[in-house]
């Protein structure tokens, strides 16, 4: 699947907020002007953004946060809409339970992109079986671990150390010494980033 490989800071500036694509622990706020759009002088517009434009921007932001392209994102939305309950919350839970995101949330990768690479390079197991599909859905009770051959990688050790200092989500339990973690349960909406307005995405696809 194609992936955006350009400057990560540019995407955060485009959305006007730090998407933590460079690092989950270090903010870009001190390095670049997040309230200034990309471009030589930072493009500005006096025109009021339409409702559609606002909804579209929110969808683009969430796609970039989780590293998902349009076709796959539409499939996630269709599945979220099919399930019982709140469609927006279902969508976020589907994205949060992707294997690459769970690896990131457990602190094995400093960014989702790095976590995705660990999965693609077969450095991750799920319930003892090697997994190499970043979009694999992790279920409650699944044990995600770093393979023995990858445990000495400096980037993994550093990422895990930083994650321990910053704290991990309550819906994962990580044993840093064993380089493994358990996906305890689906996260509740309050446990997912509060700067996402999923209702705008639901409104967009309901047009």
UniProtKB/Swiss-Prot annotation:
Span of domain S4 RNA-binding: 97-160
The protein's name in its UniProt record: Small ribosomal subunit protein uS4
Any single Pfam family the record assigns to this protein: S4
Any one GO molecular function term: rRNA binding
Record bears the keyword Ribonucleoprotein: yes
Stretches the record annotates as Disordered: 31-55
GO annotations of cellular component type: small ribosomal subunit
Key words of the record: Ribonucleoprotein, Ribosomal protein, RNA-binding, rRNA-binding
Gene3D superfamilies named in the record: Ribosomal Protein S4 Delta 41, Chain A, domain 1, RNA-binding S4 domain
Positions with biased composition (Polar residues): 42-53
Signal sequence interval, chain numbering: none
UniProt family annotation: Belongs to the universal ribosomal protein uS4 family.
InterPro entries, A to Z: Ribosomal_uS4 (IPR022801), Ribosomal_uS4_bac-type (IPR005709), Ribosomal_uS4_CS (IPR018079), Ribosomal_uS4_N (IPR001912), S4_RNA-bd (IPR002942), S4_RNA-bd_sf (IPR036986)
Keyword Ribonucleoprotein: yes
Function recorded in the entry: One of the primary rRNA binding proteins, it binds directly to 16S rRNA where it nucleates assembly of the body of the 30S subunit. With S5 and S12 plays an important role in translational accuracy.
Listed GO biological process terms: ribosomal small subunit biogenesis; translation
Subunit structure: Part of the 30S ribosomal subunit. Contacts protein S5. The interaction surface between S4 and S5 is involved in control of translational fidelity.
Superkingdom, taxonomy of origin: Bacteria
């Amino acid at each position: 699947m194609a992936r955006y490989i350009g400057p990560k800071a540019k995407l955060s500036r485009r959305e006007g907020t730090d998407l933590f694509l460079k690092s989950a622990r270090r903010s870009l706020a001190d390095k670049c002007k997040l309230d200034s759009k990309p471009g030589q002088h930072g493009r500005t517009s006096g025109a009021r953004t339409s409702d559609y434009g606002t909804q579209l921007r929110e969808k683009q932001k969430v796609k970039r946060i989780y590293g998902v392209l349009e076709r796959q994102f539409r499939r996630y939305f269709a599945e979220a809409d099919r399930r019982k309950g709140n469609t927006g919350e279902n969508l976020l839970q589907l994205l949060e339970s992707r294997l690459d995101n769970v690896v990131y949330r457990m602190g094995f990768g400093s960014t989702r992109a790095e976590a995705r690479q660990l999965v693609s390079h077969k450095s991750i197991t799920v319930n003892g079986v090697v997994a190499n599909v970043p979009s694999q859905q992790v279920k409650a009770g699944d044990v995600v671990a770093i393979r023995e051959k990858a445990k000495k990688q400096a980037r993994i050790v550093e990422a895990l150390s930083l994650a321990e200092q910053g704290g991990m989500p309550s819906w994962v339990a990580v044993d840093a010494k064993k380089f493994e973690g358990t996906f305890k349960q689906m996260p509740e909406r309050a446990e997912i980033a509060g700067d996402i307005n999923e209702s705008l995405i639901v409104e967009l696809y309901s047009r």
